């Protein structure tokens, strides 16, 4: 029997003439939750980096999970550069710094980019004109950067000889190379339309042609006088952007266009298999209920269909992920699909009526359904290919809670790793020995644990003080079951 749950709550109701919540309480942050803030995993280790601001600049610290020790790793001095956001290079010897960020659409932005070399403490602008760059990404070997300028062309910047190279030449307001337009940001939540090959030799990118998409007028009221702006907006029955895939061979200076099937109405994803030159791409029809995965054949310049997922309503698929390191697949936000080193595919589908993990051979033939039952898998948290273990989040016990589990590739040894009632999320260390577990419930404010891969709690990393709410006599939500006329 399926239940409908309603949350009945007046969380901020004051009882028995106890303290009342005022606007000042909100503005001065009387109520606050605790977390460990931003952190970046250190490669091949059980440690992560976090930052603290000082009078001199931004200090980076390394926290060791096993020993509970913290040491200062390096600093970026204000005298060198300030007011930036950052991301690490794949080898973690450099930082990509972004200044003057300006919002483009919902997820995308552009800005000025610089590279900070940690060892030499030096800053290099990304090209002689580092402004108005978007979708800037390191190559896997950390020696190059690819990016898109506001002319909607792809460019390459070699960090060894500080040389810039233009890779595409047909970019315009209508032709977008390496960066999706508004439609893909809204439909699929992504703006990134190019991928580096693992050996840094190739770039596969999507070319989006918006020529036949009609414009829609929007009024921007932020300025003193309203400004009319136009976006390419395909209404029902009107033309969508036309998309195509091209591959750039940076070493041999070759360019090829991939022959696509007629069903390639949307191309929501392109994927390089880890540690290989195998390329895959996904297509989706306009109704977004028929998804296909193709493996590209360099000899025939065509894609061979290996997976299909379809239903009568809608296919909800996130992009494939790539591993942080060979053998250990982990990302902070979780993922729904992965093509492993041996070519096997682990992916989440709702084809049996519930969201579950499936395992397929490199040619697409099924091996086994990993999880099953009348419950849902939310996403995959990490994959241990050596020991054939999948860590994932799901709702096996109840729809109103989310827990972290582990299971073998063959579907055996399903184990729940989090015991506390509530909602749990996880981020596994590169070694998969530990995971950071953020947790909260209707009665427990946000709390962060460090756990071993077995689920055993090592220590509390952050805990919200509940007493700050108690003085206001706050009530907590309660769940009740509401039955419909047919008993469901």
Protein language model features and the residues they cover:
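Beta-propeller domains
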Residues: 206-365
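Asp-box/WD-like beta-propeller blade repeats and closely related beta-sheet repeat scaffolds
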Residues: 107-155, 161-193
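Non-catalytic accessory segments flanking enzyme active sites
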Residues: 37-40, 51-60, 73, 98, ...
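Blade-terminus and WD-like Trp-Asp/Gly-His loop motifs, strongest in beta-propeller folds
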Residues: 39-46, 86-94, 136-144, 149, ...
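Predominantly five- to eight-bladed beta-propeller fold
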Residues: 29, 68, 100-105, 109-112, ...
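Blade-loop segments of beta-propeller domains
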Residues: 68-102, 129-132, 310-313, 323, ...
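Short, solvent-exposed loop/turn segments at conserved positions within beta-propeller repeat blades
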Residues: 54-56, 105-111, 149, 237-241, ...
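Short loop/turn segments that connect beta-strands within beta-propeller blades
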Residues: 65-68, 117-121, 159-162, 249-253, ...
């Amino acid at each position: 029997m399926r239940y409908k749950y309603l949350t009945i709550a007046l969380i901020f109701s004051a009882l028995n003439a106890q303290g009342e919540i005022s606007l000042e309480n909100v503005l001065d942050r009387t109520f606050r939750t605790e977390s460990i803030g931003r952190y970046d995993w250190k490669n091949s280790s059980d440690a992560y980096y976090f930052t603290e601001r000082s009078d001199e600049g931004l200090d980076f610290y390394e926290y060791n999970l096993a020993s509970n020790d913290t040491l200062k790793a390096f600093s970026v001095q204000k005298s060198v550069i300030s007011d930036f956001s950052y991301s690490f290079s794949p080898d973690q010897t450099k930082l990509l710094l972004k200044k003057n960020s300006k919002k483009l659409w919902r997820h995308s932005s552009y800005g000025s980019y610089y590279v900070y070399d940690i060892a030499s403490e030096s800053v290099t602008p990304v090209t002689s004109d580092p402004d108005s760059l978007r979708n800037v990404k390191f190559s896997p070997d950390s020696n190059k950067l690819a990016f898109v300028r506001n002319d909607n062309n792809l460019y390459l910047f070699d960090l060894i000889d500080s040389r810039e190279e233009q890779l595409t030449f047909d970019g315009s307001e209508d032709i977008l190379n390496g960066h999706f337009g508004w439609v893909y940001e809204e439909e699929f939540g992504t703006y990134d339309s190019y991928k580096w090959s693992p050996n840094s030799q190739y770039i596969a990118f999507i070319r989006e042609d918006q020529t036949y998409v009609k414009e829609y007028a929007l009024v921007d009221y932020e300025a003193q006088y309203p400004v009319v702006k136009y976006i390419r907006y395909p209404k029902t029955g009107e033309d969508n952007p036309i998309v195509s895939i091209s591959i750039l061979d940076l070493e041999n200076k070759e360019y090829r266009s991939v022959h696509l099937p007629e069903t390639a109405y949307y191309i929501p994803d392109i994927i390089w298999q880890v540690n290989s030159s195998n390329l895959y791409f996904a297509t989706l029809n306009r109704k977004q209920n028929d998804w296909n995965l193709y493996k590209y054949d360099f000899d025939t310049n065509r894609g061979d269909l290996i997976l299909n997922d379809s239903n009568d309503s809608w296919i909800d698929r996130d992009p494939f992920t790539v591993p942080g390191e060979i053998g250990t697949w982990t990302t902070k936000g979780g993922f729904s699909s992965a093509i492993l080193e041996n070519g096997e595919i682990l992916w989440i589908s709702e084809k049996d009526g519930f969201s579950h993990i499936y395992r397929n051979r490199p040619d697409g033939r099924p091996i086994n359904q990993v999880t099953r039952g009348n419950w849902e898998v939310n996403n995959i948290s990490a994959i241990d290919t050596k020991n054939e273990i999948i860590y994932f989040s799901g709702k096996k016990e109840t729809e109103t809670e989310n827990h972290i589990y582990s299971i073998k590739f063959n579907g055996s040894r399903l184990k729940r790793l989090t015991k506390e009632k509530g909602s749990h999320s996880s981020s596994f260390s590169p070694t998969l020995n530990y995971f950071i577990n953020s947790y909260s419930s209707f009665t427990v404010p946000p709390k962060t644990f460090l756990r071993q891969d077995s689920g055993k709690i090592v220590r509390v990393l952050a805990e919200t003080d509940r007493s700050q709410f108690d003085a206001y006599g706050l009530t907590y939500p309660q769940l009740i079951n509401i039955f419909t006329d047919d008993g469901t």
